Amino acid sequence: MHKKRVFSGIQPTGQIHLGNYLGAIKHWVEMQDEYENLFCVVNSHAITLPIDPAFLKSQSYELVKLLLACGIDPKQSGLFIQSEVDEHPALAWLLNCQVSMGEMQRMTQFKDKSLKNPKSVNVGLFNYPILMASDILLYQSDLVPVGEDQKQHLELTRNIAEKFNRDFGNCFKVPEPLIAKVGARVMGLDDPKVKMSKSHQGANHAIFLLDEPDIIVKKIKKAATDSMGVIAFDEKREGIFNLLNIYMLLSNESPENIEERFKNKGYGDFKKELAEVMIQALKPIQERYKEISDDEVKAILNGGAEKARPLARATYQKAKELMGLI
């Protein structure tokens, strides 16, 4: 039976944290048997904001090493770097010419990012949803895992595909969203009102996958809760709800079992056990990470790019011909 193709992209712009893992990467690992997967390190997206070239290069390899340590299997899935497939920006230019300024000006992420970095706003930042559409459409993707913050961009991608097919002839598969029901939003430890983020400045905001046990214990001790002292899954109590959600995702226990276990215990006891569950969950990832060599990473990326290029080339050539380009 033909497996549906899934395209997933991740930027190499900072350390991978628990929110990335529980919200995306863990699901990617679990769906490798069910789908044909292409995992792409979207490094061209990373240059829409100021970034040191040496850091970008090292972070790209670092990210691949972590993805492998988390369980991405290059024998099952394609894993490659965006900039190694030339058709990504080439198709993006063709798509640029099919999208109105009005559609682009409605993109909320551009507004948010430009407010945070007003001195660094460039055309690439404004335009990157088109490159994202190119990433997806190049591979005739059936499904795209998206969080809440990327839904608008996938909708734009779908609109672009439908418009192109209507105006020039059938070329692109119109992708559907693949939204994880659980774990899609892990919030910051220091501020449970905001999503856990690589770019947040707080020292105790995020748990990173390579954090040492003593660092994890320290961060969890300082994690925000409330003054009620009752351990229960209540979405209105953002701090304890976030910690319980993390515990549930790492332990695979039901909310009922967790509440029963901590019924007569305080936040200190719960945080101590949460830190231990976290340490044990991250231990095998950290051990595998240490075993992966730079040469192994480069060989896997070469193989992934070799798999991706023919797919991308076929789509780009068809789009080019349909538009009358020689």
Swiss-Prot record:
<keyword id="KW-0067">ATP-binding</keyword>
<feature type="binding site">
    <location>
        <begin position="195"/>
        <end position="199"/>
    </location>
    <ligand>
        <name>ATP</name>
    </ligand>
</feature>
<feature type="binding site">
    <location>
        <position position="135"/>
    </location>
    <ligand>
        <name>L-tryptophan</name>
    </ligand>
</feature>
<dbReference type="InterPro" id="IPR002306">
    <property type="entry name" value="Trp-tRNA-ligase"/>
</dbReference>
<dbReference type="InterPro" id="IPR050203">
    <property type="entry name" value="Trp-tRNA_synthetase"/>
</dbReference>
<feature type="short sequence motif" description="'HIGH' region">
    <location>
        <begin position="12"/>
        <end position="20"/>
    </location>
</feature>
<feature type="binding site">
    <location>
        <begin position="147"/>
        <end position="149"/>
    </location>
    <ligand>
        <name>ATP</name>
    </ligand>
</feature>
<dbReference type="Pfam" id="PF00579">
    <property type="entry name" value="tRNA-synt_1b"/>
</dbReference>
<dbReference type="GO" id="GO:0004830">
    <property type="term" value="F:tryptophan-tRNA ligase activity"/>
</dbReference>
<feature type="binding site">
    <location>
        <begin position="19"/>
        <end position="20"/>
    </location>
    <ligand>
        <name>ATP</name>
    </ligand>
</feature>
<keyword id="KW-0648">Protein biosynthesis</keyword>
<dbReference type="GO" id="GO:0005524">
    <property type="term" value="F:ATP binding"/>
</dbReference>
<comment type="subunit">
    <text>Homodimer.</text>
</comment>
<comment type="function">
    <text>Catalyzes the attachment of tryptophan to tRNA(Trp).</text>
</comment>
<keyword id="KW-0963">Cytoplasm</keyword>
<feature type="binding site">
    <location>
        <position position="186"/>
    </location>
    <ligand>
        <name>ATP</name>
    </ligand>
</feature>
<comment type="similarity">
    <text>Belongs to the class-I aminoacyl-tRNA synthetase family.</text>
</comment>
<dbReference type="InterPro" id="IPR014729">
    <property type="entry name" value="Rossmann-like_a/b/a_fold"/>
</dbReference>
<dbReference type="GO" id="GO:0005829">
    <property type="term" value="C:cytosol"/>
</dbReference>
<keyword id="KW-0547">Nucleotide-binding</keyword>
<keyword id="KW-0030">Aminoacyl-tRNA synthetase</keyword>
<protein>
    <recommendedName>
        <fullName>Tryptophan--tRNA ligase</fullName>
        <ecNumber>6.1.1.2</ecNumber>
    </recommendedName>
</protein>
<feature type="short sequence motif" description="'KMSKS' region">
    <location>
        <begin position="195"/>
        <end position="199"/>
    </location>
</feature>
<dbReference type="InterPro" id="IPR024109">
    <property type="entry name" value="Trp-tRNA-ligase_bac-type"/>
</dbReference>
<keyword id="KW-0436">Ligase</keyword>
<dbReference type="GO" id="GO:0006436">
    <property type="term" value="P:tryptophanyl-tRNA aminoacylation"/>
</dbReference>
<feature type="binding site">
    <location>
        <begin position="11"/>
        <end position="13"/>
    </location>
    <ligand>
        <name>ATP</name>
    </ligand>
</feature>
<dbReference type="InterPro" id="IPR002305">
    <property type="entry name" value="aa-tRNA-synth_Ic"/>
</dbReference>
<dbReference type="InterPro" id="IPR001412">
    <property type="entry name" value="aa-tRNA-synth_I_CS"/>
</dbReference>
